[in-house]
């Protein structure tokens, strides 16, 4: 067969890989290990579109490449099958999430296998599998049973803390704990009731129960994390979100804030990703300072990084959720305050932090005294102040902070300059808040900012009105969800005291319920299972990020029934060497998994403080939406080039009925009933659609199913084409303009091994120097590009190589066999088939990447461009060692040059060896 029949070949090798477990990873290997992992998908109902496999293809290329480079590769796949996405799909389809999840996973596996990934399916995990979430629950219990000792800078058993309480109280204990934890003696501790002791320990445990301001989404019936809310709406579904106080389980991630920051310096991640985490963690060095409330027995405490600017404080702003709002509000301001607070509660903290344009606030009617100059200043409520950051109170210095300046200007509050010199004018673009020297600042006058800060801290500590402090912007993570489809939290209650289950009681299985939809009241759906609720179990479930915070470790030993994974296997596989996934997980999964890993490191379960050594964020393959333009008030559609002549509305059109921007009008009429009677105003007898690059989405009808591409062109074409679209990290629009080129390349590669009659015909003759040069040049470039994770350039390199070998009519085994190995990571199916035809009985994945030799890359000739009076007129291929005088002779003897010389002698000939020749007339 002269042509390559991809369907037959791909089915053959996919079946063979599966039957023979070709990619099964074993620990008993003398080879160096390489653990390559994709962020596992949540199995949505829509299956994969062509954007999803981008990262999977890249990681699979690296996995296959590392195998042929002599590594023992672990390349697993699983499913993040608990959580909101799976449950929302079930709600929409009216089916139980257990059923839809199973169906969706089967569909995903079918699609993934069609693309030819080298996954070790024996290690597949699912977060909704009780055998898996038993260990998610176990980790929760360990977190509950540990506290963070700042002195040793690690988590320690809570039993150690209890012993200290029993002997000396909590004096001198340096712990990560709630801000409101009170000091007590050993006698106090012993006098506490069991409930009081439990409540006290909750203030220290790494997972704890407390009254917390949360993002409540009635539409989803659950609490959402800050990163799940955008512009006051849930990112999933677009439902309104409000702020309210609820009793919730939380994770004390803030205990690890400093280590999470420091760890970023030890891992090979994109710098932009590290910066996102640094910003989210938000470490700042500053001071705590108290302001006495005028005419009230109250004090407001602020955290500030600029204690040196206190003389410039002209008002204090307080978070809308602050518990003292009521006490601070005067009768005259009550109505205005209540209205403002209600409005502010409808915005998430994330939106309030990022919105720097909107100025809004409300005066409480109260005043405080500035402790540096005894001036009376007003207390305002402002939604840019967050209750969970610092103390929920901010001292405002309009002359030194742009947000304070905008607020003060808008509400006509005083602005006192406390710095002078270059770059100290806040109204100018070159403003630098740390420039100049202090003015209007009493004992700080004349000092630089750097000098003034320690002096100001010394002052507040001597006056006992404050002290130096390190603060973090990151808050503890809400851990409970009022939804059904998640891990049950392994806690039961007795006399209002939470007790974690014994390990022997795990897994606490998710019980079946008839009605699993969320309630708008906040009562968890598990309350509907009377038998479960009557046992006193916690009715909230874990969030979607619980199971994904440690799954990478379970792949090392997925069948283990007695531990997260066996110690020898964890020690063998170690860190994930390459982690592939989207940048959208920066402040969610990628932060939580680092937190849990550090905790498991403290427990001695993993020898690695960081889970992912290298991270690559693949870009997004975007959809190219197509539009038809309907004339308003009619069912008539005008072609894109004529739409300016009419009043139109763009309508998304299914991309499958558009070819090269031309709409199949008959297919359009059949597409939807409301378009059956559509009429068209054409240009040049065709209807031309408009185009726009957007996120690939079913609602935009721009989704391209990879199955369709595989069926038409083959999996190897899809794999190579997705890489060929551009650099892996960049986003790019999907288009099929170049896919035919990749398809034809694979057929040309196939034909190198076959004669014109279609028979396999590979010669054992010795290769020429030119053939060896093509081979070794290709091997070198492909190896170097894959090593630096540049997967688009090897596709071009192979295309050039095949064209050159085709021109040389090369069919020699010495050349084609190494090329087959080198191509196998990108196009494994055709490589396996050709490897087999070459006489090998083992998989090409067991071969060794061929070594390239520099001696074959040495150029013996150079092609000189010949310029006459600055214009290139000819090219001459000459030996690289030819002397300049001989080069001149060859140039003058050239027919093209002679024509341009017109019988005249040149004034000068300039030869730049192995570069260019200039002839000056």
Curated annotation (Swiss-Prot):
GO BP term (any one):
leucyl-tRNA aminoacylation
Motif annotated as 'HIGH' region, chain positions? 41-52
What Gene Ontology cellular-component terms does the record carry?
cytosol
Q: Which keywords appear in this protein's UniProt record, sorted alphabetically?
A: Aminoacyl-tRNA synthetase, ATP-binding, Cytoplasm, Ligase, Nucleotide-binding, Protein biosynthesis
Residue sites binding ATP per the record: 698
* Organism the protein comes from: Cytophaga hutchinsonii (strain ATCC 33406 / DSM 1761 / CIP 103989 / NBRC 15051 / NCIMB 9469 / D465)
Its taxonomic placement starts with: Bacteria, Pseudomonadati, Bacteroidota, Cytophagia, Cytophagales
Return the EC number. 6.1.1.4
Primary site of residence: cytoplasm
Motif 'KMSKS' region — list its residue ranges.
Answer: 695-699
InterPro entries attached here?
A: aa-tRNA-synth_Ia (IPR002300), Leu-tRNA-ligase (IPR002302), Leu_tRNA-synth_edit (IPR025709), M/V/L/I-tRNA-synth_anticd-bd (IPR013155), Rossmann-like_a/b/a_fold (IPR014729), tRNAsynth_Ia_anticodon-bd (IPR009080), Val/Leu/Ile-tRNA-synth_edit (IPR009008)
Q: Which Pfam families match?
A: Anticodon_1, tRNA-synt_1, tRNA-synt_1_2
Q: Which Gene3D superfamilies match?
A: HUPs (3.40.50.620), Isoleucyl-tRNA Synthetase, Domain 1 (1.10.730.10)
Q: Which family does it belong to?
A: Belongs to the class-I aminoacyl-tRNA synthetase family.
User: Matching PANTHER family, A to Z?
Assistant: LEUCINE--TRNA LIGASE, MITOCHONDRIAL, LEUCYL-TRNA SYNTHETASE
Name under which the protein is recorded: Leucine--tRNA ligase
Signal peptide residues are: none
What's the domain of life for this entry?
A: Bacteria
Catalytic activity entry: tRNA(Leu) + L-leucine + ATP = L-leucyl-tRNA(Leu) + AMP + diphosphate
Q: Name one GO molecular function term.
A: ATP binding
Quote the subcellular location field of this record.
Answer: Cytoplasm
